[in-house]
Curated annotation (Swiss-Prot):
Its EC number is 2.1.1.-. It is an enzyme of class 2 (transferase). It comes from Salmo salar (Atlantic salmon). The keyword S-adenosyl-L-methionine applies. The keyword Methyltransferase applies. InterPro entries: N-lys_methylase_SETD6 (IPR011383), Rubisco_LSMT_subst-bd (IPR015353), Rubisco_LSMT_subst-bd_sf (IPR036464), SET_dom (IPR001214), SET_dom_sf (IPR046341), SETD3_SETD6_MTase (IPR050600), SETD6_SET (IPR044430). It holds the Pfam family Rubis-subs-bind. The lineage of its organism: Eukaryota, Metazoa, Chordata, Craniata, Vertebrata. This is N-lysine methyltransferase setd6. Protein-lysine N-methyltransferase. GO terms for molecular function: protein-lysine N-methyltransferase activity.
Length: 449
C-alpha cells in the first residue's frame, strides 16, 4: 500500500489527471498496484492491476469527508432547513439537489470528480432510449414498464418537490439551468454510480435504509457477478479490498449485488454477456399463473372457486395484480409464494374449504426447505402433474410475450459477424432477452407433461 496517494499518469486524460490530483488532496489513497483507465476495461472508466494482487490486499481507502452526499455538500444547511418539504418515497431528493448544485458550481469542492462526467452522454440507461426502441428491443423483459414508471415518478418529483424548493433559493439554484432534463440525468447518475451503506443487523428492522451517496474512485469500478473486490465500510473511511487474487493486466471488479441482467440494464445501463451472469432471472407475471388456471376450469362452478382461491391468495399477500414469480438458473427464487399459490389453486373444493376454515396457511408441514426443494430444478419434474401443468402454461404465456423469437435470438448471439454489426443497445437488449428466455425455456422442459 502506498504511504501517499499514488498519482497515476494517463496521457491525454486531463479530467482524469485533475481528478487523481484531487484524490491526493482529499487523502484518498491508492495502492501502487492499481491504476484507472478507459483502455482495457469493459465499460468507460475502470481499474486495472499494474502488478499481481493477492487476496485480501487493500486497493484503496476513501476518507468519509471525500464522500459526496447531503451531509457533506455546501448546501447542507439549506437542505436541513427544508428537510420536511423534501421527503419522498425514494429518499433521493436531498442528494439530487446537492448534485444539481455541486455539478453546476465552478467553485464546487467536487468539481474535479464531477468533471469526469462532462455531459452524462455516457449514461445509456433505457430511460434515455426512445419509447419505440424500448418497446421493440425489450418487449417482455419488464424493463419498458419499469422505465415508464421511473419517468412518471421523476417528472412528478421534479414538478411537485424539486422545482418549488429551488425556486425558493435563487441564490443556489436556477430553474433555467437546473432543469428536468438535468434532474433526469442525475437520477440515472445516482442509479448507476451511488452506494448505499448497509445498516447494522440490529438496525435492519427498525431503521429506514441509509440514503445513497457518491463514492469517488469506488464508483469507477465496473461490475461482474464473479467479482474480485469488495467495498468495506468503517467509521473513518471506506476500503476496497481484493476478495481473490488478481493477475497483472486484469480488471478490478466490484459487485452491485446479486443483480439479474434486466436489473443491470435498467439501473446501470449495462448487461453481462449470456451465461456470465450467475444471478440472472426471469419473471413470470402472477397474472399468467391465474390465466393458466382459468384455462383448465371446465364449468362456471370451477371458475367461481378459482376466483375465491385467488382472492384468498391476495389476502394472504402471496399474489398481487402486478406481482411476479421469479425464477433463477437453479429454480424458483420466490418459492414460498409459488408453492402456496400452486397448492391452493390445485385444491379440491373440500380441501379448500378446510384450508380456509382452519387458517391452513399456518400449517407447519410446508416448511421452507420443502418448498425450496420442490421448486428447484431437481424438484420441478416431480411436482404433481396438475401443478406442473400450471407452471408450464404460465411459462409458455410469458415466453410468448417477447417480441423476438428465441431461435432468432440464439442465431444472432452465435453469429459473430452479425453480432458485431449490432448497436450497443441492440447487444445489451439481446443479452437480457435471451438470458430470460433461456431460463423460461428450461422451466418448460422441467415441467413438460
Amino acid at each position: 500500500m502506498a504511504t501517499d496517494a499514488k498519482r497515476l499518469k494517463t496521457e491525454g486524460s486531463d479530467p482524469l489527471q485533475s481528478f487523481l490530483q484531487w484524490c491526493e488532496g482529499v487523502g484518498l489513497k491508492l495502492n501502487n498496484k492499481v491504476y484507472i483507465s478507459k483502455e482495457g476495461t469493459v465499460a468507460e472508466y475502470g481499474m486495472l492491476a499494474k502488478e499481481d494482487i493477492d487476496e485480501g490486499e487493500l486497493l484503496f481507502t476513501i476518507p468519509r469527508m471525500a464522500l459526496l452526499h447531503q451531509g457533506t455538500t455546501k448546501v447542507l444547511a439549506v437542505l436541513e432547513e427544508g428537510k420536511a418539504s423534501l421527503e419522498n418515497t425514494s429518499g433521493w431528493v436531498p442528494l439530487l439537489l446537492a448534485l444539481m448544485y455541486e455539478y453546476t458550481s465552478p467553485q464546487s469542492h467536487w468539481r474535479p470528480y464531477l468533471s469526469l462526467w462532462s455531459d452524462f452522454t455516457a449514461l445509456d440507461h433505457p430511460m434515455f432510449w426512445s419509447k419505440d426502441e424500448r418497446d421493440r428491443l425489450l418487449k417482455g423483459t419488464g424493463i419498458p414498464e419499469a422505465v415508464d414508471t421511473d419517468l412518471t415518478n421523476i417528472q412528478k418529483e421534479y414538478k411537485d418537490i424539486v422545482l418549488p424548493f429551488i425556486t425558493l433559493h435563487p441564490d443556489l439554484w436556477d430553474p433555467e439551468r437546473h432543469t428536468l432534463d438535468l434532474y433526469r440525468s442525475l437520477v440515472a447518475f445516482v442509479m448507476a454510480y451511488s452506494f448505499q451503506e448497509p445498516l447494522d443487523e440490529e438496525d435492519e428492522d427498525e431503521k429506514d435504509p441509509n440514503p445513497p451517496m457518491m463514492v469517488p474512485i469506488a464508483d469507477m469500478l465496473n461490475h461482474v457477478s464473479n467479482h474480485n473486490a469488495n467495498l468495506e465500510y468503517t467509521p473513518e473511511c471506506l476500503k476496497m479490498v481484493s476478495v481473490r487474487s488478481i493477475r497483472k493486466g486484469e480488471e478490478v471488479f466490484n459487485t452491485y449485488g446479486q443483480m439479474a441482467n434486466w436489473q443491470l440494464l435498467h439501473m446501470y445501463g449495462l448487461x453481462e454477456p449470456y451465461q456470465s451472469n450467475s444471478n440472472d432471472t426471469a419473471d413470470i407475471p402472477m397474472s399468467n399463473v391465474y390465466k393458466a388456471a382459468v384455462q383448465v376450469t371446465r364449468s362456471e362452478a370451477e371458475q367461481r372457486l378459482l376466483v375465491e382461491k385467488w382472492s384468498l391468495l391476495c389476502e394472504m399477500e402471496m399474489v398481487g395484480d402486478k406481482g411476479v414469480f421469479i425464477f433463477g438458473k437453479s429454480g424458483s427464487l420466490t418459492d414460498t409464494e409459488m408453492y402456496t399459490t400452486l397448492k391452493i389453486l390445485c385444491m379440491s373444493v373440500e380441501e379448500f374449504e378446510d384450508f380456509r376454515e382452519n387458517e391452513g396457511w399456518e400449517e407447519a408441514d410446508d416448511d421452507e426447505e420443502k418448498m425450496l426443494q420442490a421448486l428447484s430444478n431437481e424438484g420441478l419434474p416431480s411436482l404433481p402433474p396438475v401443478w406442473r401443468c400450471l407452471v408450464h402454461a404460465a411459462a409458455r404465456f410469458t415466453l410468448d410475450s417477447y417480441g423476438e423469437d428465441m431461435l432468432k435470438d440464439k442465431v444472432l448471439l452465435e453469429d459473430k459477424d452479425g453480432y458485431a454489426k449490432l448497436s450497443s443497445r441492440q447487444r445489451r437488449a439481446l443479452q437480457v432477452r435471451y438470458g430470460q428466455k433461456t431460463i423460461l425455456h428450461q422451466l418448460l422442459e422441467l415441467t413438460k407433461p
